[in-house]
Regions:
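Beta-strand/beta-sandwich contexts
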Residues: 3-50, 56-62, 68, 82-84, ...
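Short, compositionally biased P/S/T/A/G/V-rich stretches that sit at domain boundaries
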Residues: 10-29, 103-134, 217-229, 234
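Acidic, glycine-rich catalytic/binding loops that coordinate metals and/or anionic ligands
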Residues: 109-119, 217-235, 256, 292-294, ...
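Glycine-centered tight-turn motifs at strand-turn-strand junctions
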Residues: 160-187
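Zn2+-dependent peptidoglycan hydrolase active-site motif and core
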Residues: 266-309, 328-339
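Short glycine/proline/serine/threonine-rich loop/turn segments at secondary-structure transition edges
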Residues: 80-85, 185-193
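Surface-exposed, glycine-biased beta-strand/turn segments
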Residues: 195-282, 315, 324, 353
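Structural beta-strand segments of beta-rich domains
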Residues: 34-38, 130-136
Length: 363
């Protein structure tokens, strides 16, 4: 227990663990040699005091280095063996959902060709200007104790759209490369499927080990992902109602859905208007990013959006809930799309239905 602000006692929250990966002395993402470093991710990890590892005669603890409330690192004790780790907090403990393999036979940087021994890419579907950007985590061995690598992003045709030079990458450590969705010229990459390719700096591909090939056979491609410019705003079951040109000077598309479903920004941008109106109910207007000055409008929200005028919004960020406020006969989102320079800023309304249905098909 601890003293709460203003007096009294409170119980600190219990930690929870979502994943554990190897950071150093690794042969795979979850295979580590004694003395190596692991990273634990989860929630409320700021309350952690130790990481407990399985040992031949029970368990052995190691001190933690807390890097945030959602990540910590720990050094693997010499007498640790394979099994699930436990994060021990001040009032409770939490086990990892996956096992950590501890292997004292790992040999790092023993010469020869650079080998790619582990890789994972996420998210499988990313959005331009979204919260989560395509990222590959990978481990290489062979070559020297450290190697100069090149990581390419290629399109469906194998054409390189972006390259990153990674210098002095230590063999047996987890390296991460994140793509911002831009080509070498700085333009947003078109919708489609992409992949990461890890190479030696001379351009030759790193040799893929059997563990990575097995992952591909199991249907989990550790290199591929897709990226899109927009995300469908209604995050749940829905149907389409009145479209552009329906009665009452209808200037958008109605998407019928249950009240309370989350609404997300179809495209990143800046909040231009956030207000309540007798017809529109609670509504928000976002001037969209990378469109030359267009706007998207979301009407009939259940509650006023918590966002403020001038706030920056990411693609896929929650902006409110489906509602029936204003002149609405049922729960729905009324969505409008305006050309540059935007909503009642000199732009004109455009038919959003074809675009909505396209976003709907992949979101």
């Amino acid at each position: 227990m601890a003293i709460a602000p203003g007096g009294g006692l409170y119980i600190p929250p219990s930690p929870s663990v979502s994943d554990v990966i190897c950071l150093s002395n690794c042969s795979e993402l979850r295979t580590v040699a004694p003395g190596g470093t692991i990273q634990v991710t989860g929630q409320h990890l700021e309350t952690a005091e130790d990481v407990s590892f399985k040992a031949d005669d029970g368990r052995v603890k190691a001190p933690v280095k807390i890097t945030s409330d959602s990540t910590l690192t720990a050094k693997v004790p010499d007498d640790a063996v394979s099994g699930r780790i436990r994060v021990v907090g001040s009032v409770a403990a939490a086990s990892s959902p996956v096992s950590l393999e501890v292997d004292d036979s790992i040999e790092i940087g023993k010469g020869g060709a650079v080998k790619l021994t582990a890789a994972q890419t996420g998210p499988e579907r990313a959005y331009q200007y979204g919260n989560k950007k395509p990222t590959i985590d990978f481990i290489t061995t062979g070559g020297g104790s450290s190697n100069n690598l090149r990581v390419d992003v290629t399109d469906e045709d194998g054409q390189i759209v972006r390259s990153y030079n990674e210098e002095s990458v230590k063999a047996g450590t987890t390296e991460s490369v994140t793509w911002n969705g831009r080509t070498e010229s700085g333009k947003a990459a078109p919708n489609g499927d992409y992949r990461f390719v890890v190479r030696s700096i001379d351009g030759s591909r790193a040799k893929v080990t059997s563990s990575v090939r097995r992952a591909k056979k199991d249907g989990v491609n550790p290199f591929r992902f897709s990226i899109y410019g927009y995300k469908f705003p209604v995050r749940g079951p829905h149907t389409y109602g009145d479209g552009l040109g329906a009665g009452r000077g209808h200037q958008g598309q109605d998407v019928l859905a249950k009240c309370g479903l989350k609404l997300v920004a179809a495209r990143a941008g800046t909040v231009y208007f956030n207000d309540t109106d007798g017809r529109a109910g609670n509504y928000i207007v976002i001037n969209t990013k990378g469109t030359g000055g267009g706007s998207n409008t979301y009407m009939h929200l259940m509650h006023p959006s918590s966002l403020k005028v001038g706030d920056k919004v990411k693609t896929g960020q929650v902006i409110g809930l489906v509602g029936d406020t204003g002149d609405a006969t049922t729960c729905h989102l009324h969505f409008e799309q305006w050309s540059a320079p935007g909503w009642y800023q000199g732009g004109s309304v455009t038919d959003p239905t074809p675009e909505l249905k396209k976003w709907d098909s992949y979101s």
